[in-house]
Amino acid sequence: MHLDWTLVLASRIRKVKCDEKKPCCQKCIDTGRTCDGYESPFRVVTSRSIINGARASGIPGAASRPVRPALTEISPADIDLLNRYFSTKTMFDVKLGCDEEAREVLEASLTDPTVRHAVSSLRSLREHLETSGDVSASAAQQSPSYGYDYGVQQYCMALGGLASNLSSPGSNALKSALLCCQIFISIEQVRGNYGTMAQHIIQGLGIMHEYRARPTLDDANNLVPAHHAQLPLLDAFVIKLFAAPCKFAEPSATADKEGGKAVSMCAISRHEQTVGSRNLRTIVPDMRTELTRISTSTLDFLVKVSSVDSAGNALRLLPEKTALLESLKSWLMDLELVHADIKSPGTEPLAVSFLRLFHQILKIILVEALNSSSNLQAELRTENDRLQGIGSIIDERVQSQRKNSSALDLIDNRLKCPA
């Protein structure tokens, strides 16, 4: 597998010319890039440029705001805070259950600068989200913010450090990569860039499989033991992120909290919540409940895979894997029947698109489990492309939602304050 985080970094500081409609052409959305003529939100910025920009924009206290020192010890409060920052769902009082993952990341950040930069980025971007209500690139460019710029700078530094480490991957570099990948997924979720989030998921799951974070079977059904160094289990982390309750899809859900504009992993627009939402609210929770049940069973299955110590034990788990894949297949068929009247993925409720994303992630995780056969890569390319496609569709929907929201706000302001 090609560990190309260098490409991910380069795509954020390079502009691309294309003949499609800017700035939402499919070519650029799929690669996480920005059309030529549009400023990349992932530009590399220095501390001096951030300070100068803050002074020029008149942001109170931004120029003199001190950079918080790195942690020297880990407290329960630190763990709880990072666990909360892993997902925007926690802004709506949802419990995530990633305390151990948070502890592992924070412990690594004490000695690993790359992980430390990633944590710092997530913290800054999440704090900016909670204070401003939006961390979209357009919002940041219209209202420059030290927190946003600093978060982007730290993200670029983490990506650069990771690409350098993976030029000769050893156990420490692999652990760093998987921990950073967890944080990168959370960063892109905070920023609402679901196509790029999908890229990080694909990349991280690929590293897990290639370097055997869990035991597997070869073509001859011989056991291939797990990597000698215990690697972070990114698959379990991602499942927990998506399986956490989504208040937007629950019958008792209300509109976004205190008028905030953040889009969660299961967000539904205000229009979708008020127009024709009665049927959606009775259908989506049921579909989500079943998918969550499958994800819980998948987590249990992965625990069993990790403890496999013989080929015989591994082979006895294969029927369970097959049953889970069949459950996913049946779930998708049911979803298509429920939404048979929807002609295009771009017109279905966002909540449904996020369920599709979760379904595809579970499928990839299960396809990779206990499988290192020679034909696996061809199958994974197809499944990864599907995941990337779903992420890109969600990107388009979220960006369109933001534009519509901005336009409505502008009209509303003009009506209130006529020229």
Swiss-Prot record:
Swiss-Prot/TrEMBL induction comment: Expression is negatively regulated by the leucinostatins biosynthesis cluster-specific transcription regulator lcsF.
Compartment(s) of residence: Nucleus
InterPro entries: Transcr_Regulatory_Proteins, Zn2-C6_fun-type_DNA-bd_sf, Zn2Cys6_DnaBD
DNA-binding region(s) from the entry: 12-35
Source domain of life: Eukaryota
Pfam families per UniProt: Zn_clus (PF00172)
Main location: nucleus
Gene Ontology cellular component annotations, sorted alphabetically: nucleus
Keywords annotated in UniProt: DNA-binding, Metal-binding, Nucleus, Transcription, Transcription regulation, Zinc
Gene Ontology MF term list: DNA binding; DNA-binding transcription factor activity, RNA polymerase II-specific; zinc ion binding
Cited PANTHER family: ASPERCRYPTIN BIOSYNTHESIS CLUSTER-SPECIFIC TRANSCRIPTION REGULATOR ATNN-RELATED
Function of the protein: Transcription factor that may coregulate the expression of the gene cluster that mediates the biosynthesis of the lipopeptide antibiotics leucinostatins that show extensive biological activities, including antimalarial, antiviral, antibacterial, antifungal, and antitumor activities, as well as phytotoxic.
Protein name per its UniProtKB record: Transcription regulator lscL
